[in-house]
Amino acid sequence: MNLETIIGLEVHVELKTNSKIFSASPTEFGAEPNTQTSVIDLGYPGVLPTLNKEAVNFAMKAAMALNCEIATETKFDRKNYFYPDNPKAYQISQFDKPIGENGWIEIEVDGKKKRIGITRLHLEEDAGKSTHTADGSLVDYNRQGMPLIEIVSEPDMRTPEEAYAYLEKLKSIIQYTGVSDCKMEEGSLRCDANISLRPVGQEKFGTKAELKNLNSFTYVQKGLEHEQVRQEKELLSGGIIQQETRRYDEATKKTILMRVKEGSDDYRYFPEPDLVELYIDDEWKEAVRASIPELPDARKARYVAELGLPAYDAHVLTLTKEMSDFFEATVADGADAKLTSNWLMGEVLAYLNKQQKELKDVALTPAGLSKMVQLIEKGTISSKIAKKVFNELIEKGGDPEEIVKAKGLVQISDEGTLRKVVTEILDNNEQSIEDFKNGKDRAIGFLVGQIMKATKGQANPPLVNKILLEEINKR
């Protein structure tokens, strides 16, 4: 029996508003527990929620960027459940009239493009955060009432790799709109995954498992990969899949049962009586649409068409808005686009990945990188020397020209000076000359290495090659 994997994702994104969705409480991350809450957030008797218009604008902006149809009439509902981090015993969410529906995004895996549908995007408030210790449980209500959008995908993904690509693309689009920073480590992007298997050709879905507590895109992919194998083994051996909630455990690299779900959750939704229905007219929609900046796909296409970058470069540079904006600013300052791309995709990304940092955390600036790239273009420094300058720029900042002068790194491009060095090297390496003339091309590499060593890496490489061949041919 051949089985097909069905994957759908539910993503919660915290909106970057200055105040909460139904109160004036601040939303700053990392504050002392229970210092950013109010009687409205905690559901004291007699208090009334007031809808944050900016949260609605942000939700509309995200929905439009995800190609959703925007509702003209939308409303809020009470989702009823009891849990210690939910002080009101209900959550204000949206049930049957979400703010956005029928959207899609396009992903690419192994060179193949695929459209993934988005069922709905709705607004809701976040719950508090429980922390369980050996002495008991603690609840921090700072997060209670934070504005969220929940983005529910269609079950269109067939592999864990597609799920990873979907999350990357979704995060990128949301970050470009500016409505959220999407930092999983701070809880501003969270993901639950649903996965089931069915015989190829069967219309009906199999019984799904829900994966929770997935704190990185890599964990989402790994969790789905394991669950895919677990369910396949169970089904092929004649077993039955139960509807379960599971979590991915990195230590064992397995999904672990959290609870068995005997039926669908009944949250007894009913319309929120303290909030009127919301009417979104065309004028409001168009005002929000006009505020949407250039999105990653459009920016990627522009890099290829206008800057002549390879499609791969354009893809990597536009994965995050931070990197793309840095690239744009560097090129706008006069640097060559392809050379800038090479440095960002090479040395810069390697440094950031090794140090586990973001661009905003380092001393390198677009102006600094631009000036360094232009020094390479002019022949003032070689790419090899530039790496020494780069190390200083990214660690301490500064002016590339001043660094070059202070460290004596100016490239030697004087032909007379280099010819003298080349002649001395050849005089001391007659065997290498013979080897080269006898067809051993590696000999030229050895000679170039000796010249670079003699000049402390500061010789102009193209000029060295030219002079070297000229001098060899004279002998």
From Swiss-Prot:
Pfam families: GatB_N, GatB_Yqey. Its EC number is 6.3.5.-. SUPFAM superfamilies: GatB/YqeY motif, Glutamine synthetase/guanido kinase. GO terms for biological process: glutaminyl-tRNAGln biosynthesis via transamidation; translation. Keywords: ATP-binding, Ligase, Nucleotide-binding, Protein biosynthesis. The keyword Transmembrane does not apply. It comes from the Bacteria. It catalyses: L-glutamyl-tRNA(Gln) + L-glutamine + ATP + H2O = L-glutaminyl-tRNA(Gln) + L-glutamate + ADP + phosphate + H(+); L-aspartyl-tRNA(Asn) + L-glutamine + ATP + H2O = L-asparaginyl-tRNA(Asn) + L-glutamate + ADP + phosphate + 2 H(+). InterPro entries: Asn/Gln-tRNA_amidoTrfase_suB/E, Asn/Gln-tRNA_Trfase_suB/E_cat, Asn/Gln_amidotransferase, Asn/Gln_tRNA_amidoTrase-B-like, GatB, GatB_C_1, GatB_Yqey_C_2, Gln-tRNA_amidoTrfase_suB_CS. GO terms for molecular function: asparaginyl-tRNA synthase (glutamine-hydrolyzing) activity; ATP binding; glutaminyl-tRNA synthase (glutamine-hydrolyzing) activity. It is an enzyme of class 6 (ligase). SMART domains: GatB_Yqey. Allows the formation of correctly charged Asn-tRNA(Asn) or Gln-tRNA(Gln) through the transamidation of misacylated Asp-tRNA(Asn) or Glu-tRNA(Gln) in organisms which lack either or both of asparaginyl-tRNA or glutaminyl-tRNA synthetases. The reaction takes place in the presence of glutamine and ATP through an activated phospho-Asp-tRNA(Asn) or phospho-Glu-tRNA(Gln). Heterotrimer of A, B and C subunits. Belongs to the GatB/GatE family. GatB subfamily. NCBIfam families: gatB (TIGR00133), PRK05477.1-1 (NF004011), PRK05477.1-2 (NF004012), PRK05477.1-4 (NF004014). This is Aspartyl/glutamyl-tRNA(Asn/Gln) amidotransferase subunit B. The gene is gatB.
